Regions:
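Kelch-like beta-propeller repeat domains
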Residues: 20-359
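Sec-dependent bacterial lipoprotein signal peptides
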Residues: 1-19
């Protein structure tokens, strides 16, 4: 597969009112093309990060929605890929991944049975030291896909999502959360986490800064969600909405953060949300930066993720995408794969943001 090397300059000059003043400005950043893996281009994959290694797992590709169960390891220091052991089960899409104590975990998602698909709840542990998978307790919240996941304090957390097979009084869209203890005894590795007061959401996203998880985006049916939450392992706190809905006009400018199927990652103590789809119809190519010290977002619709790349069944220059995944070390952030219409991607980009400066 052809891979074109390109860096893209991005404009990031929006200033947001409130505690942000006209003196604060985030300057240009750059997307840098990295090596692509030697596997099938895809969307709705899962990912997790262990140290300086990112892992890409599963997803699907093509008009027939061929579900994948392969695993790829990206060495960030060497910009190289290695194929690892496949998951020992059928391929899946829209699962979630997280890492705890040097091991990666994949759970939930959707698998294919002939021409139809159904949601699952099985959980699998990957040990990079042995390149082997081990089955763990099934996710206690039940089957679903499009959930979100993160890890803090030596535990993994999974919540929200949708069970498209729900019947009767059961709600398809979920707002529950569960904690995974990798050292727990068999049969007791998952426990419910209470206190989340946010919306039911499908294809939301989460990022972690200093052992605090931040949850945003996603949709409920076709409505994009504006609520924004943080969780420190014990307490949930609602933050300002990610849309200009505040009656006190905290946000002077139009916010365009709301979306689902987005990618998030952390660089230097700031969270980033990129790509995705708005109102279930309009693909996004922009990215936004969140400063937890100010509880403010920076960016605008001109801050595009606009890599020029070889895409499949689509004209070159396409950039907007949904259902991509990300890697995050806390100091480096990557966006890879995804889909745009009938196109699927295998490209990998790293964001190199410039620092905030006083002007």
């Amino acid at each position: 597969m052809n891979r074109l090397l390109v860096g893209i300059m991005l404009l990031a000059t929006m200033c947001i009112a409130g505690s942000c003043t006209d003196e604060d400005e985030y300057t240009q950043g750059q997307w840098m093309k990295k090596a692509s893996y030697n596997g099938v281009y895809r969307a709705y994959a899962s990912s997790f990060t262990i140290g300086d290694y990112g892992y890409l797992c599963g997803g699907f590709y093509g008009a027939n929605k061929d579900y994948l169960n392969d695993l790829w390891e990206y060495d960030m220091s060497r910009n190289s890929w290695t194929q690892c052991a496949d998951m020992p089960v059928a391929g899946r899409k829209a699962a979630v991944g997280f890492a705890v104590n040097g091991k990666g975990y994949i759970t939930t998602g959707s698998v294919k049975d002939g021409s139809s698909s159904y949601c699952v709840a099985d959980t699998w542990e990957y040990d990079p030291a042995t390149d082997a998978w081990t089955r763990k307790d099934d996710f206690k919240g039940g089957v679903r896909d499009g959930a979100l996941a993160f890890s803090i304090g030596g535990y993994g957390y999974v919540g929200t999502g949708c069970n498209s097979d729900a019947t009767g009084s059961e709600s398809a869209y979920k707002m529950d959360f569960y904690r995974f203890n990798p050292n727990g005894a068999e049969g007791s590795q998952w426990e419910a986490v209470s206190g989340y007061g946010g919306e039911k959401r499908y294809f939301g996203t989460a990022f972690v800064i200093d052992e605090v998880a931040y949850i945003c985006c996603g949709r409920n049916n076709s409505t994009d969600l504006v609520d924004f939450w943080k969780f420190d392992g014990s307490n949930w706190t609602q933050l300002r909405d990610i849309a200009n809905t505040d009656s006190d006009n905290d946000y002077d400018d139009d916010y365009a953060i709301t979306r689902s199927e987005a990618v998030s990652f952390v660089i230097g103590g700031r969270g980033f949300v990129a790509t995705g789809i708005r109102n279930s119809t309009s693909l996004s190519s922009d990215y936004w930066l969140y400063d937890p010290d100010k509880d403010l977002w920076y960016g605008d619709s001109d801050d595009d993720f606009t890599p020029i790349t070889d895409v499949h069944n689509y004209p070159s220059g396409a950039s907007s995408r949904r259902a991509a995944v990300g890697f995050s070390t806390g100091e480096r952030g990557f966006v890879l794969t995804g889909t745009s219409g009938t196109s699927y991607f295998d490209d990998v980009y790293e964001l190199l943001p410039d620092e905030e400066e006083e002007v």
